[in-house]
Amino acid sequence: MPTLKTFGIILLFWVHLMSAQQLRVTILVEPSVTARDSGLNVFIAGNRSEFGKWNPSSIRLERISDSLWKFESNFDTLSFLEFKITAGSWEQEALFDSNKSPTNTTLQVTKDTTLIIRPLFWKRRILQQKPEPMIRGKVDYHRQLGGDGLNHNRDIIVWLPPSYEKNTKKHYPVLYMHDGQNIFDPTTAFTGYDWRVDEVADSLIRMKVIEEIIIVGIYNSPDRLPEYSDSELGSAYMNFVINVVKALVDSTYRTKQSKEHTGIIGSSLGGLSSLLFVWKRPDVFGMAGCLSPSFWYDDEKTLKEIREYSGHKKHIKIYLDCGGREKELISGYKRMVEILKTKGYKKGKDLDYTFESNGTHSEHYWAKRVWRPLVFMFGRR
């Protein structure tokens, strides 16, 4: 007679078998504006390597006809998929409403599935002219900055706090942010949604929740992936931020230059990069905000490095978060929290973290919770 233990073994085997099963996902795209009309090809960009890891021009769909494109691939059962359709760049994203960019399409793979996507517009078709920036407060632009070892120049945008021009004797802490085109202005944000950091910071400052800060957005480049990782280009990017961007900001604006008044924030690979900045250069950066950090990247290299670190505790503050619908990131987020605890970091003191159960990997959700690292880093004491 089968025992309870036997049933348990059978159940575990069944769960393992289900998780290892490969299921077929087919995505059909039928745009209203056809290739014959627009001269465009169709691409998919998303959270999986099969989707090109959010590269908008990496994975071209198979063209079946002038009005139909197809993507097919196998995925493990229960895989969480998140993607968008483009015509080769984020400036040519597929739209379903002429007034705004769509949120990511998501799918949990539980069976062989066919999705039909019917875009009504391509973004560049409805942008007849470049829209005016939509930013609260005063900003300065510094164009085409370059650094040793980097392949691309980039812009930075500097947001100044409300009292900056009136209180000419005051000096301010500085927050640096990766993916700078996405943080203030929806007209430059790659999905059409920005983080609204200008509005959030302005409100928190006027409510006297945080101290006044200068915010520096550093635009990304086509080398975003290696620049935001622990690599040769990543080291060159870090040196660029310190020796070019920070040097320019400190010489141009009234800043508090010490590490205690210098923070850095990013999301996804930018979240990974932010942790690398404070961990490798705690003499320069005293605070890091890591939203939806990609600790899985490069075979979890950063997780391993910090877990194996045996030196003195670094005097830094770290904020981490993750969304419940970011399946590939949850494990790394939770393990990093526990690793930092074992290194002596304490919640509410030099460590803070939050888990948003419905959060997805998108600017929309990062905008909703960016107030948390701002308060943790720059809250009035």
Describe the predicted segments one by one.
Residues 79-83:
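Exposed beta-strand face motif in extracellular beta-rich ectodomains
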Residues 101-171:
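A domain-start/cap signature at the N-terminus of enzymes
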Residues 165, 226-268:
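Gly/Ser-rich "nucleophile elbow"/oxyanion-hole loop immediately N-terminal to the catalytic nucleophile
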Residues 181-239:
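Active-site machinery of serine-nucleophile hydrolases
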Residues 258-305, 311:
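Primarily recognizes the serine-hydrolase "nucleophile elbow" in alpha/beta-hydrolase
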Residues 321, 326-381:
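C-terminal catalytic histidine-bearing segment of alpha/beta-hydrolase fold enzymes
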